[in-house]
Amino acid sequence: MAKRQLLMLGIRTSFHTIAAVLVAGLIFTAVFLSRNSLPKENPQSHGVTDRGGDSGRECNLFEGKWVFDNVSYPLYKEEDCKFMSDQLACEKFGRKDLSYKFWRWQPHTCDLPRFNGTKLLERLRNKRMVYVGDSLNRGQWVSMVCMVSSVITNPKAMYMHNNGSNLITFKALEYNATIDYYWAPLLVESNSDDPTNHRFPDRIVRIQSIEKHARHWTNSDIIVFNSYLWWRMPHIKSLWGSFEKLDGIYKEVEMVRVYEMALQTLSQWLEVHVNPNITKLFFMSMSPTHERAEEWGGILNQNCYGEASLIDKEGYTGRGSDPKMMRVLENVLDGLKNRGLNMQMINITQLSEYRKEGHPSIYRKQWGTVKENEISNPSSNADCIHWCLPGVPDVWNELLYAYILDHHSS
């Protein structure tokens, strides 16, 4: 009898154990399936609000079209921004066709978040944001300063400091928010580092030296890099040594290779000095030029001078951008991410390709005496590199704003 009771007890115990295991398995399976039924976040996604009705569909902020919008644009008035650069103030210097101010970027399947200067300043409260790079990045910095200063009603609550060095500072006092620009056109140390005296026939870089510049970015909360146009020559001299001493070793290196080396030097510095939990990193892709009108069906040997319309061919690419350099940048950023540090590329290249009419052309301050041939042939003096403000760089900053405020996730 006792043996039979023990046997029955063992059977019941085994049954309960098996049942418990089965229940646990069912619970685990249900949780696993429910987790995997959720939409997965793609780290490369550029999505915001999907307008297509399919919530699982990703949106790329950088694929879209320009829409004329003279109701909500421009985001500020050229004459109202006391920080405007004369190099970019096209209306002030005589441009009559002002339609370049009224174009809004519309992604194909979503909406770009509307820029809100107050929200950005709140996000930047007690923080520092710095743009690092060449004059294109300086133009984007001017754009951002104009965009945020337009919501500050007290002119005494903001100021700009420029003592002629590489660093220019904008401060919004009420928020203790700093938005800086730092001149470093090749990112690493070079013979073009002087903010005013930087044009030489030979471009020379110290490819492994970046600390001279980088110490000015340390402890920033947001860093926005760019570097493109200053590399555009077949070969660049690389210096092993210092500019002060005469015993340095110079070697001409193919441009794409030395560009990659500079980006790797930047990456190595960031890995050592940047806390990814504190600092957000961005890299603006290349800003295209429009110096050959024949590329978009215009007159041979002409450029952006006199252009008043956009390029309407979707996917248009001219020779003012370099796919090889773009691939190098993407590969370096991918490698950096694989090592645990994310630097988001803001891909402004394709959307800017369409805007051949957005450059200053001849409508800017002339820093020297205008030559006779430039008067008779204005296109020879046209700036088809930089951008009028308000204009294209405002959209670059709207894209940047979406990432800073994390309004880019699906």
Curated annotation (Swiss-Prot):
It is found in: Golgi apparatus membrane. InterPro entries: TBL (IPR029962), TBL_C (IPR026057), TBL_N (IPR025846). It holds the Pfam family PMR5N. The keyword Transmembrane helix applies. GO terms for molecular function: xylan O-acetyltransferase activity. May act as a bridging protein that binds pectin and other cell wall polysaccharides. Probably involved in maintaining esterification of pectins. May be involved in the specific O-acetylation of cell wall polymers. It is a single-pass type II membrane protein. Contains 2 motifs that are conserved in esterases, but it is unlikely that this protein belongs to the catalytically active pectin esterases. The gene is TBL34. GO terms for biological process: xylan biosynthetic process. The chain crosses the membrane at residues 13-33. Keywords: Golgi apparatus, Membrane, Signal-anchor, Transmembrane, Transmembrane helix. GO terms for cellular component: Golgi apparatus; Golgi membrane. A motif (GDS motif) lies at residues 133-135. A motif (DCXHWCLPGXXDXWN motif) lies at residues 383-397. This is Protein trichome birefringence-like 34. Belongs to the PC-esterase family. TBL subfamily. Its main location: Golgi.
